[in-house]
């Protein structure tokens, strides 16, 4: 099998859990649109493929390929944390390798480049064995990636087994941070089960990223200048964010639950939009406390809550707040955040949610859970000053009411928050303008991946 300079074959290896695969597909779609002669074979688990490619018709030059999820036939899940992820990781290299060989046979084209989620560190080995470039995509921010790239330094300085009770300690030696709370470093650096498959995956990732032909991250220079500067000295870094650019004008057929008409009837910057993503829902006691705070403060709210709301919310809450609220199983988040009536986004501080809030110019109330949530919350509150973190990272009625009052009341603090997030919104809007860094870096990425020079 041989390939010409055009008609190349690119393998895309996403991490098929949480919200990782969607932003990977988003940037691949942009590359595929600019390089119509290049075939992008997108490998993921059957469930992920079904979610990302609901139509049976292929997307022009992007071809989905299902690979094994690593779950043995007849396996019964025990409910342990990350059990499905651990099974996938154990079989991941072999699963992707088998998928790529099948795609080469199907297309009659050798793979010329491997593009992977940075989590899939073993993609470096696969690319080396194939003799092709390895390009990696980091779907989170530069701040969390910097911590993973300097894990050895952090552990040597603070000690791997001497961190209990030191969560509130402020440290000033981590490259990319003027200072950071020790407990806000990403999971797997000094806190959590450091020997778990997930933590080991992150550690190994940090050890091999320097081998990548490019490390494209979902951020832009103006948002994280110091972490970007540090990473650029260590890696072949390309800031190509936001991976999910600001959406086109709202379309009614994307709003099946009528969120936008409901928002149209509300005052400007008065509504709290609540959305915790797909894997980070607060426990029932916190959901109840959040509901009580919304009711007691008479805050209008739109809540994206997939589960039966009556199952978690206080008795009679839905009836008592019927004039204030709209609770839906799904909301068109980008459209909602862009609406003039939304005054705050209550979320888990996942990177995608943070970036979408920045793009829309909406302040944040954050309740972090795990992963990069804590360091994102640190950046939101202490560096960018575009929101507040729920005190103690636990919703209580009193704490939540205080946060709502701080962000939604028309005082000096609220004005400062909106001015700050508005500043970063302008940076996000300009990121893909002519001759801007993200635009130039995306062209560089396209040249590396597809051999195109725009």
Swiss-Prot record:
Activity under varying temperature: Optimum temperature is 30 degrees Celsius.
Enzyme Commission number(s) of this protein: 2.4.1.115, 2.4.1.294
Residues engaged in binding an anthocyanidin: 18, 20, 148, 371
Any one Pfam family match given in the protein's UniProt record, by short name: UDPGT
Span of the signal peptide: 1-21
Keywords: Flavonoid biosynthesis, Glycoprotein, Glycosyltransferase, Signal, Transferase
Keyword Glycoprotein found: yes
GO molecular function term, any single one: quercetin 3-O-glucosyltransferase activity
Catalytic reaction annotation: cyanidin + UDP-alpha-D-galactose = cyanidin 3-O-beta-D-galactoside + UDP + H(+); cyanidin + UDP-alpha-D-glucose = cyanidin 3-O-beta-D-glucoside + UDP + H(+); delphinidin + UDP-alpha-D-glucose = delphinidin 3-O-beta-D-glucoside + UDP; peonidin + UDP-alpha-D-glucose = peonidin 3-O-beta-D-glucoside + UDP
Top-rank EC class of the record's enzyme: transferase
Pathway stated in the Swiss-Prot or TrEMBL entry: Pigment biosynthesis; anthocyanin biosynthesis
Family the UniProt entry places it in: Belongs to the UDP-glycosyltransferase family.
Function, in words: Flavonoid 3-O-glycosyltransferase involved in the biosynthesis of anthocyanins conferring flower red/pink colors, mainly anthocyanidin 3-O-glycosides. Catalyzes the addition of UDP-sugar to the 3-OH of anthocyanidin, with a preference for UDP-galactose (UDP-Gal) as sugar donor and cyanidin as substrate; able to use delphinidin, pelargonidin, peonidin and petunidin as substrates in the presence of UDP-Gal, but barely active on malvidin. Can also use UDP-glucose (UDP-Glu) as sugar donor with cyanidin, delphinidin, pelargonidin, peonidin and petunidin as substrates, but not active on malvidin.
Descriptive protein name: Anthocyanidin 3-O-galactosyltransferase 3GT6
Species: Rhododendron delavayi (Rhododendron)
């Amino acid at each position: 099998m041989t390939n010409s300079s055009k008609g190349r074959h690119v393998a895309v290896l996403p991490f098929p859990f949480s919200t990782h695969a969607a932003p990977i597909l988003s940037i691949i779609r942009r590359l595929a649109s600019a390089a119509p002669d290049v075939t992008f074979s997108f490998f993921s688990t059957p469930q992920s493929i079904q979610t990302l490619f609901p139509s049976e018709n292929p997307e022009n030059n992007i071809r989905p390929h299902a690979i094994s999820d690593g779950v043995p036939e007849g396996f019964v899940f025990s409910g342990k944390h990350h059990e499905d992820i651990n099974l996938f990781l154990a079989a991941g290299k072999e699963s992707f390798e088998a998928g790529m060989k099948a795609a080469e046979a199907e297309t009659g084209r050798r793979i010329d480049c491997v593009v992977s989620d940075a989590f899939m560190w073993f993609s470096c080995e696969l690319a080396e064995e194939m003799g092709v470039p390895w390009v990696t995509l980091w779907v989170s921010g530069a701040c969390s990636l910097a911590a993973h790239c300097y894990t050895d330094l952090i552990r040597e300085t603070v000690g791997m087994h001497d961190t209990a009770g030191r969560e509130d300690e402020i440290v000033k030696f981590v490259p990319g941070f003027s200072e950071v709370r020790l407990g806000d470093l990403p999971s797997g650096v000094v806190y959590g089960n450091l020997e778990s498959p997930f933590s080991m995956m992150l550690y190994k990732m940090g050890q091999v990223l320097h081998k990548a032909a490019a490390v494209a991250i979902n951020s832009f220079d103006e948002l994280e200048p110091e972490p970007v500067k540090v990473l650029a000295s260590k890696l072949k870094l390309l800031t190509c964010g936001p991976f999910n650019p600001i959406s086109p004008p709202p379309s009614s057929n994307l709003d099946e639950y009528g969120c936008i008409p409901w928002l149209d009837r509300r005052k400007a910057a008065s509504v709290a939009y609540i959305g915790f993503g797909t894997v980070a829902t607060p426990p029932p006691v916190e959901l109840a406390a959040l509901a009580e705070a919304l009711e007691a403060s008479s805050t209008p709210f739109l809540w994206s809550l997939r589960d039966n709301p009556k199952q978690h919310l206080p008795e009679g809450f839905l009836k008592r707040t019927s004039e204030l609220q709209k609770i839906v199983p799904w909301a068109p988040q980008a459209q909602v955040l862009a609406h003039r009536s939304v005054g705050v986004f209550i979320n888990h501080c996942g990177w995608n949610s943070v970036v979408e809030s920045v793009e829309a110019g909406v302040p944040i109330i954050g309740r972090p859970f795990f992963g990069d949530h804590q360091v994102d919350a640190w950046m939101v509150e202490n560096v960018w000053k575009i929101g507040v973190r729920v005190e103690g990272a636990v919703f209580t009625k009193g704490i939540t009411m205080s946060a709502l009052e701080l962000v939604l009341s028309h005082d000096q603090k609220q004005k400062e928050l909106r001015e700050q997030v508005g500043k970063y919104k302008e940076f996000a809007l300009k990121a893909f303008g002519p001759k801007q860094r993200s635009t130039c870096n995306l062209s560089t990425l396209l040249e590396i991946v597809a051999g195109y020079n725009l």
